[in-house]
Amino acid sequence: MSHLFAHLARMKLIQRWPLMYNVRTENVQEHSLQVAMVAHALVIISNRKFGTTLDAHQATSLAIFHDASEILTGDLPTPVKYFNKEIEAEYKKIEAIAEQRMLDMVPDEFKEDYRSLFISDYADPTYKAIVKSADTLCAYLKCLEENRAGNTEFNTARKRLEAMLESNPNPAVKYFMDCFVPSFTLNLDEINKML
């Protein structure tokens, strides 16, 4: 018997941004879906606009599971995770243990299919970078949504993430920012007017 999917089902119970006041809370499961959709889009943009031949499904699969180990660790807030180099190094060890525990739940005959999805060191670096970009984009979108709802709690995070995205070397990220992100500052009536 494997407890893998019983654990994965608990992704919806792990709240993100735990130290911040949220107008609307976000859980790891819904965040992972959004990251998967954005990672898929980044690959499509990259292939169609910038001549790459990447596999959108590989990026999507990696994105779905990118935070799965948080079922075991919880979502440690960024200021805590990166407080200093010692804490960051120790947390990476904790993450590695949690990733291995996730893989250990997979039946032996499927372990190789899941290894690169659960163990970040086994993930293809190209797709890992795409998922990291998508993850950053989604965190930025969360900040925009909170700001639009009048919550200034996310201002500092928004500025930090915006700077990260502006310095991102992937041209698909800039394209996504220019094409899709502005809509996140609009309300539903404004979005519907544009249809």
From Swiss-Prot:
Record's keyword terms, sorted: Cytoplasm, Hydrolase, Metal-binding, Nucleotide-binding
Keyword Transferase included in the entry's annotation: no
InterPro entries, alphabetized: HD_domain, YfbR, YfbR/HDDC2
Record site feature (Appears to be important in orienting the phosphate for catalysis), residues: R16
Family matches, as Pfam families: YfbR-like
Name of the molecule in the record: 5'-deoxynucleotidase SO_2484
HD domain sequence ranges: 28-140
Cross-referenced NCBIfam families: PRK03826.1
One GO MF term attached to the UniProt entry: 5'-deoxynucleotidase activity
Record keyword Cytoplasm present: yes
Enzyme nomenclature, EC number: 3.1.3.89
Assembly and binders: Homodimer.
Primary residence: cytoplasm
Reported function: Catalyzes the strictly specific dephosphorylation of 2'-deoxyribonucleoside 5'-monophosphates.
Localization of this protein: Cytoplasm
Catalytic reaction(s) noted: a 2'-deoxyribonucleoside 5'-phosphate + H2O = a 2'-deoxyribonucleoside + phosphate
Organism: Shewanella oneidensis (strain ATCC 700550 / JCM 31522 / CIP 106686 / LMG 19005 / NCIMB 14063 / MR-1)
Domain of life: Bacteria
Cross-referenced PROSITE patterns: HD
Family: Belongs to the 5DNU family.
UniProt cofactor(s): a divalent metal cation
